């Protein structure tokens, strides 16, 4: 999670860090887990907003900030391994993890089992492929082609992408109740007429363009045998599409959250 992307989420969510009730300004929150914390900026912001909370951010790589609020700490951890936290949480925040999880059913149940009764989980996810509502994104789009190849490589590597439309049922099967689904749009550039979406599009464009080259180079050369030169040509075509304001494309961004019942059923082992 980059700081740029974090600020894009703040703009999308009307300056809130998430949509589940623990993100309300006056909410009194206990223990919080941020999965895939990246630079840790979400944890730092949440810790500043909720000084009464105890926040733990976990990630596979240690790119954590040097200075943090006293109620925030970080750990290098692999969430695919059994969870061994000594105490349960009141809010689990999981953002942009699609393509990073081996088994979403297992992951959702781990979240359930590691929440206190009445605790909340929130998954914030988007599909890799953009879409359009007016047919201006051509079926032979280079961006769609590369997104499909990246998705194939992720699945071959044991990290399948779950369709965002399936997350509500995923939480329900895990035992969560009061599930809400909120849908937003991240335009590929400043094509929208609406001023807010135009601003979101500007940030969204910078977010995808800044990371596209590295993402596509690693996956296309390793998983699909492309040459570096082929990737460079492809990326130029993708950047051209990302900039094209006649293509009214966007990524649907979903916030799905649910509550663990106050009287939860007996829990499985991790």
Question: Each predicted region: which residue ranges?
Answer:
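Conserved alpha-helix/loop element of class I SAM-dependent methyltransferases that forms part
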Residues: 1-31, 41, 45
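Eukaryotic intrinsically disordered and solvent-exposed regulatory patches
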Residues: 14-22, 40-43, 59-62, 76-80, ...
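Class I SAM-dependent methyltransferase SAM/SAH-binding core
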Residues: 26-87, 91, 106
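Residues lining the SAM
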Residues: 94-98, 124
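Short N-terminal helix/helix-N-cap motif within the alpha/beta-hydrolase-1
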Residues: 101-103
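A short glycine-rich, Lys/Arg-flanked "PGG" loop and its adjoining helix->strand segment in the class I
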Residues: 105-120
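Conserved catalytic/acceptor-binding region of the Class I
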Residues: 120-213
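C-terminal lobe and adjacent flexible extensions of AdoMet/dcAdoMet transferase-like proteins
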Residues: 174-270
